[in-house]
Amino acid sequence: MNPASFRDCKAWQADGLSLSTTSNEACKLFDATLSQYATWRNDESLGGIEGCISAMQKADPNFVMGHAIAAGLELVGTGSSLRLNERLAGDVARLVEMAAGQSLTPRERLHVSGVEHFAKGRHSEACEAWEEILLDHPRDMLAIKLAHDGYFYLGQQTPMRDSLARVLHHWTPQIPLYSYLKSMYSFGLEETRCYDEAEKVAKEGLEMNPQDGWAAHTVAHVHEMRAEMDKGLQFMASTEKGWEVCDMIASHNYWHWSLYFIEKGQYEEALTIFDNHVMRLCKASGSMLDMVDACSMLYRLEMEGVNVKDRYRELLQQTKPHTEDHVLLFNDLHFLMTALGAKEEATSRRLVETLQELAEAPGENLQHQLARGLGVPMCQAMVAYDQGDFGKAVELLRPLRYRFTGIGGSDAQRDVFQQLLVHSALKSDKKQHQKFARCLLVERDAARPNSLLTNRLIQRANALHI
């Protein structure tokens, strides 16, 4: 990144995105923070995101948008619960109070509103606030990226795609960060199963910027969803030098790489990626994305019959402190995978019980509202599967399978729960469940022809003489 390109007060104003501060230094550091967020990369020459935020708040302690981006990025990281983190709760409260006492632009007030909504678990309302900004300010990258992340957590694939479609024509290739609009739009296309267009748009982004880790990520998804394992392996190897510098997405891209090996039944190769990259980066970053990837990878391997118990125990040291966070159901379900895999019954029980308590009195928090009818029964199904009660797992998951999108994440990420349902049905001693497994596999084969993983499961079903 080129510090000389970061905008001062006048440059922000010239772009129609005035910031309520007189500090040019604060404005430039705001731009530096935003650029690193958009590019999935902590630039150590700038001090990384944390360093830029710290310097920005020193340059102007009363800069509302500086506090908004700081709180917003911590919140969308989903690693801190407002219920449990008094410092974060205080930061959000001070942001709202500071905004109330200043003369801000309507755009800035909407940003504060979006952060406050997200902090309180009102994710849909947060996205509405960011979309309101984009009606008048379609080149507000912070609103674009926060809405993109918000829709992702909500599992709202079509709004995630359309949010970018609405603003893209307002940008030109000469505007900094333009390629990242291509990559975000391509991901929305992929998640709405427009695979050809998604690949085309993502590769346009990569042509402009080979270090666009999110564009590479979209192509990885396309190959996964088409069951193009060899193409996926070749693509990841050929682009690794570009995206491995994006520390906030690199581990996730290695996770995608490993999925191709799991699909092919090459488990040792998958474990090598886990040990050399996924787990190493997870321990270094402590990020939720890196953690849930590691959880998911081990769970998939375990369902394939691979012994990963020792790795579960190591991973539990990362996930256990977040057992009672309950920020996202998606995170909770993945942390439960590791607690169960490590045979930590007390941790597993505590996670499910505390989630149940929140589900009984969810208030305005959307995730807690969804917990009662979605998150808790999914957790109970995982516990039942772990205890060998496969029939119960089927009965819990079967009514929910078309609602899995509600936990957020991508189709590729949520497929672990579809796989869990298939394995549960195959292992159940009830013939109707085994017949249901056959139907599920027919569905999988129709949606992703030539999937080696599906073929292995079909062979297992054939052995049952269903």
Regions inferred by a protein language model and the residue ranges of each:
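Structural motif corresponding to the intra-repeat A-B loop/turn of tetratricopeptide repeats
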Residues: 39-40, 77, 120-121, 154, ...
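TPR alpha-solenoid repeat register
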Residues: 66, 109, 142-143, 177, ...
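"A position-specific structural signal for the A-helix of alpha-solenoid helical repeats
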Residues: 24, 31, 35, 69, ...
